[in-house]
């Protein structure tokens, strides 16, 4: 760089700086030789500034400018002037830099794809050349904004008496939850660490260590099959508080959301958020993370069909089941029979045996079931669903009300997405509360903790933890935004006797509980304050704030569907000596 040192960033200059001498540096986004005058767009982490080389430019500098190509790295000095032909395509479109000194710091080969936002690029190619993809403004900005979001989070917690504490990332593997990533110990042959799925146990022990309020922006790892919104390694905004109630935790976190949305998006979020019990969320929306930006709410029409002679419904009701419905109001012209058949496939994917329908059009009603109903049943159904000409009624029956509602909930979402019922500019927050404490695993043949084994049961359910696990609810809460679970938490058990009962309800022997969680159980013996906390997926939070379609867009180097990282080639085979040092022998399946 010689004696040149940056004095300004490209994206931060304006008309207020016109007439100033300055030095800027970055990469050439593109260069255009107009014959006697050369324009070049210089890009740095803040934005783009147009460089100008003309007849007044020193000859040696102009000669260098003639060699400029895309992605050459340069530093240059010159005078900032007001542009004659202004543009609103870039933030600095009112000014340009007339260059008097230029140094080419690094040349560049032709890139495998153009680094412009308007160019569609194959995802595999983008991930292979992630460092190039991140130079594009639309891919660069989310990482910068993510950093600002993290700064606000840290500032907010520090302002509210939290202490930032780092917990270990080489920990003991414990049961429950997803599969652990394991790390072999070289110094203790045959022993393994696990990478943390969350700092859960350590943050609870911090409360038992006298730290009143803790937070951490933590790296976490889960060896599970990937979905669109999941990564094997992810970042979690983690928090825990002592001497608080569920209400206190919600208030603190509503304040965090309020500050983030105001400082990042200049949006005033209204608090407190709606609190919706889990049973209500499932019953009305068919989801424990309901999207409340649109209607199409699920209705319970079981009473309408009491005594029905329509055999499919009658059989379900005889078995103690339920019939649920939604009214796709005014969509009869858009939901053809073919469309409804596709919705039926959606319902079946989520466990429904079928999707009954009625299309109410000006030409009459077409239905898969109405001819089997009495006039009284039809009238009662129409009244219950406020049905009128132009509507489509969709019904699911099942012996399991959760399954029926879940299937209709997915149908509801499919209709809304395909028919423009969702306002993309809305941010609808709510709390889902009073989750079931347990869920039964047919595969395991036992009750499992819906969240984790340390979740506090509701006071009215304490006597039922072992005798009737399915009837127990938890002091647990999820914060939901636009149909996405952004974070969740609970109050924790701080009574050793209750924790022992919880372990027994989950099928743990005393020996197994002590083997897995003995260090936590020992800590409880020395006095444990009431405590609770929350955790957010930072990647998902940033994705929602910036309205991105995938968390890959807000992670610098994301993994793909097979948990690989295309740019570096991870994971990879390792040297035989490394395996020998770790006392590991491989037995690979063909």
Where are these predicted regions, by residue range?
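Class II aminoacyl-tRNA synthetase catalytic cores and aaRS-like
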Residues: 1-590
